[in-house]
Amino acid sequence: MLNKRAQILLKTLVERYISEGQPVGSRSLSKFSGLDLSAATIRNVMADLEDMGLVASPHASAGRIPTHQGYRFFVDTLLVVKPLDVIEIHQLQDQLHPDNPSRLINSASQLLAELTRFAGVVVSPKRNSAIFRYIEFMSLSEKRVLLIIVTPEGDVQNRVLFTDRNYSQSELTEAANFINHNYAGCAIDEIRTRLQSELKQLRQDMTSLMTAAIDAGDAAIRENSEAVIVAGERKLLDVQDLSSNMASLKKLFDLFERKTALLQLLEFSRKAEGVQIFIGEECGVVTMDEFSVVTAPYRVDGKMVGTVAVIGPTRMAYERVIPVVDMTARLLSSALSLH
C-alpha cells in the first residue's frame, strides 16, 4: 500500500501526463503536488513507484509516465470523478428521446463520441431467447397476414405470414388477444412448449396461425438481435497519442469491423454493476494494448439488456469519460423502459 505522500505524487504525475502528454519530471511534481519536498526526495519516491511497476522512464534523462498498472491504481484509488454539468445532462436528455428504439441506440453512440471526442459504442439488447411485449395481426390480401411484433425494448418488427386460408380481421384480433393475454413476456421457446398442450381446444387452423406467428416472431427478433453500433471512430485519428501509431489504429478499426471480439470484450460489462474500466491488456484483446475501454450496462424494466462504452487512448481524462458513460447508460435505460 502506498503512503499518502506517494499517492499524492502518483496522482499528480498521472494528471499532468493526461493533461500534457509529456513525461513528468520532479520539478513539475514539486510545483503541482502541493508538497514541500526536495527534488531528491521526489526522485526517491519516483524510483520506488518505478520498482512497483506504477511508473516508467521512457528515456534515461526524461521524467516518468504512468504504466497501465499505474493507471489502474489511479482509477481505483485516486481518481476524483467530476459530475456532468446541467447543460450536458440536458443535452443527453434531449437527444435520448427519439420515437424509435433503433434511433435511440444510434443517438446514444453518437452522443458518447461527441461528448468524449473518442469512439462511442452501444451494444443493442441481447436476446438469448426471443421475448415479445405484444403482437398484432393485420389482414392483407388473400391468404396473407401481416404480423407486427413489439419487443420489450419497444422495437417493432414486421413479418408477412402466408396462410392456408383467409382470416377475417375479427379472427386475427381474437388470435392476437389470446397470445398477448397468455404469453406476452414469455420466452419463445417456452411458448412453443405450451402451445402443444394449451391450444388443443382451438380449431386446427387457428393453432397453425399462432404457431406460424410464434416462429416468425422468433426469427424476426433474433435476426435483429445484438447489433454493435460504433460512432466517432474517426475522432481517434485526432488523438495525438494514436495518430502517430497508425498500425495500432488500423488494428482497432479492423476490430470495429469484425465486432465479434468487441462483443466479447463488452460482455464483461453485463456481469457487473455500474461503470467498468479496462486499461490496455485488461481488455483481453491484443490489438487494444494502447487503449482503454469505459463501459456500463443499461437496462429495460430493471433487466440488463445491453452495454454502452467509450474507447480511447489509455491517456484519457477518466474523470470526464466515466460520468458521460454512466449518465448515458442511465438515461438510455429510462428512455427504453418508457417504450
From Swiss-Prot:
InterPro entries noted in UniProt: GAF-like_dom_sf, HrcA, HrcA_C, WH-like_DNA-bd_sf, WH_DNA-bd_sf, WHTH_HrcA_DNA-bd, WHTH_transcript_rep_HrcA_IDD
Gene Ontology molecular function, alphabetical: DNA binding
Keyword Transcription: yes
Domain of life according to the entry: Bacteria
Record's keyword terms, sorted: Repressor, Stress response, Transcription, Transcription regulation
Membrane spanning residue stretches: none
GO aspect biological process, one term: negative regulation of DNA-templated transcription
HAMAP family the record matches: HrcA
NCBIfam families reported in the protein's UniProt record: hrcA
Role description: Negative regulator of class I heat shock genes (grpE-dnaK-dnaJ and groELS operons). Prevents heat-shock induction of these operons.
Membership in a protein family: Belongs to the HrcA family.
Protein's name according to its UniProt entry: Heat-inducible transcription repressor HrcA
Organism whose genome encodes this protein: Nitrosospira multiformis (strain ATCC 25196 / NCIMB 11849 / C 71)
Lineage, highest ranks first: Bacteria, Pseudomonadati, Pseudomonadota, Betaproteobacteria, Nitrosomonadales
Encoding gene, per UniProt annotation: hrcA
